[in-house]
Amino acid sequence: MSLSLTVTLACFAHFCPVADAAMTPQDPAPKLAPADQKALQGKLAKFVETQIAYDDPAAVGKAREKAQKAYDAAREAFWSDWKKQSDKHGDLLKSIADLEVIFASAIPYERKQAMTLRKIDAKDPVPAYYLSVPKSYKSETPTRAVLLVPGLDDKQEWVEGKKWFDATWSDKAPLASDTIIHVPVVSKAVELDTMPDYSKTESEEQEKQRIQELLLSFGDTQRGYNVDRARRFLDAGKGACGFAVRFACHFPDLFSGVILRSPMAVDELRLGSLGGINFLLLSSADTAAACDALKARLDKVEGVTCTILPTTDAYPFAAAGPEIEKWMAGCKRIVNRKKIVIEPNEDRFKQAYWVSIADMSSVHTAPEGSKPRVEVEADRAQNRIKITAVGVESLMLSLNDSLVDLDNKFTLVVNDKAWEEGKRNRDFNNLLKRMVRKNDTQFLFPVEFRVNVPKPEKKADETGAGK
């Protein structure tokens, strides 16, 4: 698949930084001087940009020859500098601090101007949506973004996008001066259920429409604008909060924070996948009990931070804006999390950060206690990865040197069975492909491989031994 097509598809498949965006205290300092990092960053950006132009099917004849020359020159310039720096400083693929700077501009964006909230017309297959882009926006600088999902009005209909924007944030809010705000247009027939009832014939089609209206449109924004992947937020109104929690469970590495303006019970959902996400629950007299109950559940999920914010005005609580912004300032996604839990709520959604389940039992048919779940913990000090899996036959691990030392063999412990993994070679081209596929310049993993979960040994009475 061409790089240009992969960039486009990544925004729909997953909806789609700076040097410190995903570093952890264990990561060594950069090897390169800032000027050398910046030089490689610019050359990689040109390399990717010219490859996309070369892959363009519309480039034929002299246009293709011109694109070929530009691509060859950019590729040679990047690899020449990469080799020079690698010869001097060692393998750059092991230096996370350097990679994050070098890849920060690897996904190209058109130069677009700021705009107050404006409706973007539907363009098949992307539905219509509203978009606000701050005056401070620059295509070369990652910008915080909010997916603002409207709530229901008194007639149980979804509030129109501009009306909802004005009721919650508006152009005058400080947030609008430094944040991209995306408001989907939700059709009257769409129900943002906590969990669809797939026994109904229309459920699959309704789920497809939800994804188109909310997620496909947000992917369009991420393709067109330089959205900071470490600072994406989901802000949901009444009637959409259950769906917001489900969406966060499906895509745990998509949002750094989730704001629920009318929290509700989500008893149908397993919440184990939410580690790493910050939650802000807006509490009123009507929702105080629901806030307390949801917080009690979220507090039991390792890696989740949940805050209740008492409100002082009427729903949807525009007066809470300054406190919400203060909370948002402290939220930032960390990609290289050392512990990952995946507890799927649907069979299709089974990936988080650097772990994805390949083969598993069906969530919908497995008995309680045997539903698929995997817990993966990387210990770089011991150069060990521990995996505890239930209902899972195999999984894929994407690794970098923040998680384990790839210069040496490392130990895998899967359901208490340990073995030594041989040294894995870092691969630049596959790292680049995975980053583009994910549409995320912080997703930097030069190694990927499959782990098969050992089948449990049968007990003596099950094998007939001793009879």
Where do the PLM segments sit?
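C-terminal catalytic histidine-bearing segment of alpha/beta-hydrolase fold enzymes
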Residues: 27-34, 38-41, 288, 292-384, ...
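Primarily recognizes the serine-hydrolase "nucleophile elbow" in alpha/beta-hydrolase
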Residues: 223-224, 230-276
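Short beta-strand/loop motif that positions the catalytic acidic residue
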Residues: 280-283
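C-terminal beta-sandwich/jelly-roll accessory domains of carbohydrate-active enzymes
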Residues: 344-466
